[in-house]
Design a protein with these regions (language model features):
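Alpha-helical multipass membrane-protein architecture
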Residues: 1-169
Length: 169
């Protein structure tokens, strides 16, 4: 059920946005009204980025992820978010769309490899296995980033997009 899946995704993004808002809001001493606006905006930005990038990246590559993150950066600046919450917002929104696109590619490929849904039982089992594989991939990626991030960034290895975001701010 698409409506249930998107609704569940939005709730999950909202929960993460609330957690990020509380942490960054307390850290940067945001006012209550600004904090509430940030929570709502970041949840909207995440779901919008997920849909825009997820759908368009299947046809036009990774550029939409950069473009939507830049748009949310500019809108966040116009709203007046402090730099720390704004940086978190941009990172948050830029992560949601490409993740959705990757999952769409994975599911589409699996669907084709399993015979385009001709065997319903095989299709459901295949989706379950893909889901488990993606969770394992997420856990491995999380651990590697936690271990290697400090070493990576201490060498000045930043994605080229950081210069655009920094120049915009």
């Amino acid at each position: 059920n698409m409506k249930k899946a998107l609704g569940g995704g939005y709730v999950a993004y909202l929960v993460v946005a609330v957690l990020l808002a509380v942490i960054t809001g307390i850290w940067s001493e945001m006012g209550v009204v600004q904090l509430v606006i940030w929570v709502i905006f970041s949840a909207f930005a995440a779901i919008a980025s997920e849909l825009i990038v997820g759908i368009s990246a299947m046809y036009s590559g990774w550029f939409p992820g950069f473009a939507t993150a830049l748009i949310f950066l500019i809108v966040g600046m116009l709203i007046g978010f402090p730099s720390l919450p704004l940086g978190i917002l941009v990172a948050y929104t830029s992560a949601t769309g490409p993740a959705f696109s990757d999952m769409a590619y994975d599911l589409k490929c699996g669907y084709i490899l399993r015979g385009c849904g001709q065997d319903q039982e095989l299709e459901l089992e295949g989706r379950k296995q893909q889901y488990i594989s993606e969770i394992i991939g997420f856990i491995v990626a999380f651990i590697l980033v936690a271990i290697m991030a400090k070493q990576y960034f201490s060498q000045g290895l930043f994605a080229p997009v950081d210069a655009t975001f920094a120049a915009t701010i």
